[in-house]
Amino acid sequence: YERRASKGDADEVDRILLEHKPIAHKIRHIIDKLSPQGVQRERGLEDGDEIDINAAVDAMISIRMGKQPDTRITMRNVVKNRDLAVTVLLDLSESTNEKVGGSDKTVLELTREAAVLVSTAVTGIGDPFAVHGFASEGRHDIHYYRFKDFNQKFDHEVKARLDGMKGGLSTRMGAAMRHAGHHLLAQPERRKLLLLVTDGEPADIDERDPQHLRHDTKKAVEDLAMQGVHTYCLTLDPDADRYVARIFGENAYSIVDNVERLPERLPNVFAALTS
């Protein structure tokens, strides 16, 4: 099931980071909003630790005007700890080897850029995250690759694995998502996000009915949700409107119309996750 990821040139990943540095910074800023950290002030309380001067003044004004004052005039400081784990799951099927129209880049190269940008952004914040990938050759042969695990640093070895990723075979999403969920659910963090990056719908060599694999993927999304894992699909398929909402839900996917702009769209994806 799980296979060793081959290695490439880590310097290529550093080149991606240099090329898209402003975008990586923007992604980091948005991810940071997912779980605020540090001391935050909660206002509008009836049993807080100290008086909120502004609220007290408003209450006095209401009394003088003969109106019923708002009695929630206290506040307290609360420590907010980050409580988030993220898995980026990459579709590495054969179709990712195809060139993007009017470009020298393949879908796989754009997928790699997405993984690298998310990785550097989350690394900067300090949240535990993993980058895994998958392809399939029938229901009994799922190829699952772990490029980076939660307890690993985003270091030279991880970068080499990301550069060494290859595309091949088919796309049995449901099984791969369940396995990704298995690793994600082992993390102690309360909030868990699974970001699937794909260029098409579920497919495999031993299944001729696409509806069956769509249903299986939808079931995987539902099962993960019941266990506390939020799934979001970033799809590069321009025709995904036909099926993606039924699988992932109305507000749990984003279609990238121009795949060359995938790195620029990632901040929008994480912004949607915060809503």
Question: What is each PLM-predicted segment?
Answer:
Residues R139-K192, L234-R242:
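Von Willebrand factor
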Residues T96-F129, A180, R214:
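…and closely analogous acidic/polar surface helices at protein-protein or active-site interfaces
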Residues R76-V107, V197-A203:
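MIDAS-like acidic motif and immediate structural context at the N-terminus
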Residues G181, G200-A245:
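VWA/integrin I-like adhesion module and closely mimicked acidic/polar interface patches used
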Residues Y1-A85:
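Acidic/polar low-complexity segments with low predicted structural confidence
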Residues E250-S275:
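C-terminal helix of von Willebrand factor
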Residues R82-A85, L89, E94-E98, I125-M165:
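Metal-dependent catalytic core segments for phosphate chemistry
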